[in-house]
Amino acid sequence: MVNEEMESSLKVIDVARVTPSNSDSSESLTLPLTFFDLLWYKLHAVERVIFYKLTDASRPFFDSVIVPNLKTSLSSSLSHYLPLAGKLVWEPLDPKPKIVYTPNDAVSFTVAESNADFSRLTGKEPFPTTELYPLVPELHVSDDSASAVSFQVTLFPNQGFCISVNAHHAVLDGKTTTNFLKSWARTCKNQDSFLPQDLIPVYDRTVIKDPMDLDTKILNAWHRVAKVFTGGKEPENPKSLKLLWSPEIGPDVFRYTLNLTREDIQKLRERLKKESSSSSVSSSPKELRLSTFVIVYSYALTCLIKARGGDPSRPVGYGFAVDCRSLMVPPVPSSYFGNCVSACFKMSLTAETFMSEEGFLAAARMVSDSVEALDENVALKIPEILEGFTTLSPGTQVLSVAGSTRFGVYGLDFGWGRPEKVVVVSIDQGEAISFAESRDGSGGVELGFSLKKHEMDVLVDLLHKGLEN
């Protein structure tokens, strides 16, 4: 994934093992995967890079202050989140994988130095996404075991540093990941191990009810999905924990971040109201749900489909993750550890719908209806979602969302201020758009895109022109 030229911009100083602190870490812990975890167990890991601007970041300061503080606080935080130091395994006689932590298990913590241009990686102009890859630590995954998470901290001398997280999606969802990062940041900044109740993880798996045997249905669906990737052949090892094949990303794939202000979003809201009232298309019986998510996602996916261009009859689809904690009956605690995320997908669409004059409005109607239809039954549809990918037409453009404006990633202060930029690197592995709250806390939305250069040029133009009109 990382070529020699990129590797030369990075010097690895140390690769350490960080173990959880305190006496609790002397106890073993086993957590079975739930059906929510199994939805994600073959998908690519989630890679985040959090940049901090710090012109005082000399190598001596990095070595003597930043790295020791991060390692000590990481060890302390892991004592509350023991499964992160453990491994994902699938024993021969077990019906499904489980997370196992045993004393002396540890996370990998890489310390590195980069001569890359910090301001370019955190700036507003598009740049090759492969420039981010040296900053992301490897995550060990083999047939019989997988690490839960790995970390890397990289110095950009006299510019700043970044903290990178590579997280296995079967172990934790975005909510759990950001809860852990908030715990780590708080511990590092305050130099104490106290955590408020909302950051203390809940490990009780009985809060996830499975009366429909979704576990088995999801594993069977994954078996059929795997056969699509092997040309119809039976997988050699049905219990392999190796992730699905991911595409090789070349130097022609570019990364771009768009900041939509609250005013931009309001402008798009008014445009949808106006288009809806004067639309030639028969109105939906339901009123449009013009939430920030509906507006922003509809706008982004419309621009992405237009940027791809091509045959208007080509197949497209869209989807987004759904946090089910509050949808479940009874509700699942907000600090539940693991995955409590399903997904909503709408397939069998054509590009023509979005490329037309009223494409933005058509997208908003569909996304609005998708959001309005969400209830506790969204979890029951997981096997159906996976089955849908076995019959997908080749070349279908399927757009999705990574992250959320609710995670509060720009509040991750480890003691050196707010992040300069937070990047979800793993959107390269699928046509995903990353979502985060705006850095300035003004109610805007930050979107991340990853596209081939020629499409990115068109996309940037479409995104900005749409806001001008």
From Swiss-Prot:
A motif (DFGWG motif) lies at residues 413-417. GO terms for biological process: response to toxic substance. The active site is at residues 169, 413. A motif (HXXXD motif) lies at residues 169-173. Keywords: Acetylation, Acyltransferase, Detoxification, Transferase. GO terms for molecular function: flavonol-3-O-beta-glucoside O-malonyltransferase activity; O-malonyltransferase activity. Coiled coil: none annotated. It is an enzyme of class 2 (transferase). The keyword Secreted does not apply. Disruption phenotype: No visible phenotype, but no malonylation of glucosides. Signal peptide: none annotated. It catalyses: a flavonol 3-O-beta-D-glucoside + malonyl-CoA = a flavonol 3-O-(6-O-malonyl-beta-D-glucoside) + CoA; a flavonol 7-O-beta-D-glucoside + malonyl-CoA = a flavonol 7-O-(6-O-malonyl-beta-D-glucoside) + CoA. The modification N-acetylmethionine is found at residue 1. InterPro entries: CAT-like_dom_sf (IPR023213), Plant_metabolite_acyltrans (IPR051504). Malonyltransferase acting on xenobiotic glucosides. Has activity toward 2-Naphthol glucoside (2NAG), 1-Naphthol glucoside (1NAG), kaempferol 7-O-glucoside, kaempferol 3-O-glucoside, hydroxycoumarin glucosides, phenol-glucosides and isoflavone glucoside (daidzin), but not toward 4-coumaroyl glucoside, kaempferol 3,7-O-diglucoside, salicylic acid glucoside and phlorizin. In vivo, seems to be involved in the malonylation of 2-Naphthol glucoside while PMAT2 would be involved in the malonylation of 4-methylumbelliferone glucoside or 4-nitrophenyl glucoside. Belongs to the plant acyltransferase family. Phenolic glucoside malonyltransferase subfamily. This is Phenolic glucoside malonyltransferase 1. It comes from Arabidopsis thaliana (Mouse-ear cress). The lineage of its organism: Eukaryota, Viridiplantae, Streptophyta, Embryophyta, Tracheophyta.
